[in-house]
């Protein structure tokens, strides 16, 4: 009887010791907060972390938007926006421009003096028109030497006819317009111009 009571006391004591140790272990795992610990880092967006690249990417997106074959009612404004955004970049930012079609050469490459060209998009055509149609080129020197020289020769040979120009590549038209501020008609625009001017004899 005494032995059983002694055994019960030992078991009860062991259980109490286990509970005490368990409580100490769980409390000991919690460290007091350090008032001097740094505040958690706040994640930053790529735009705020890399502002130069963000500015360059914006220009690349604007260039890609006008590197298309379809002209819309927004094309003129898009061309202007792309050039203004490019002009606002630093030289270092311009080197970062890269898109599906965009690169620093789109605005940065020197292809000659665009002011030497004549887009031949004037009204007052008269009744007779020679419409010179080509794919076109955005290289200013080549456009002056090749396309313009042919148009000038035709105008000299046929003084009673008005020589006008149309490009079939809207991508090139947009490029020249955005970069140099030169407006060249596409085929639809050229034909609409002929109708608006009352042209009766049109040779393409």
Roles of regions detected by a PLM:
Residues 31, 37-41, 45:
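Intrinsically disordered, low-complexity proline-rich regions
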Residues 20-23:
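C-terminal motif of bacterial Sec signal peptides marking the signal peptidase cleavage site
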Residues 2-10:
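Bacterial N-terminal signal peptides that target proteins for export
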Residues 25-28:
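Bacterial signal peptide processing site
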């Amino acid at each position: 009887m005494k032995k059983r009571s002694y055994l019960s006391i030992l078991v009860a004591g062991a259980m109490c010791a286990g509970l005490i140790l368990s409580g100490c272990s769980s409390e000991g795992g919690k460290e007091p907060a350090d008032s001097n610990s740094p505040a958690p880092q706040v994640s930053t967006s790529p735009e705020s972390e890399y502002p130069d690249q963000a500015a360059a990417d914006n220009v690349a997106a604007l260039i890609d938007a006008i590197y298309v074959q379809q002209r819309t009612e927004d094309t003129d404004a898009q061309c202007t926006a792309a050039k203004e955004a490019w002009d606002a970049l630093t030289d270092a930012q311009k080197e970062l421009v890269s898109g599906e079609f965009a690169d620093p050469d789109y605005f940065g490459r020197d292809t000659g003096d665009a002011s030497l060209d004549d887009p031949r998009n004037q009204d007052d055509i008269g009744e007779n028109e020679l419409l010179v149609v080509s794919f076109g080129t955005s290289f200013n020197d080549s456009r002056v030497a090749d396309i313009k020289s042919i148009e000038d020769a035709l105008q000299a040979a046929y003084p009673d006819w008005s020589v006008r120009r149309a490009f079939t590549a809207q991508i090139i038209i947009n490029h020249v317009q955005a970069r140099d501020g030169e407006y060249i008609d596409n085929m639809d625009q050229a034909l609409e111009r002929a109708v608006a001017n009352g042209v009766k004899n049109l040779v393409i």
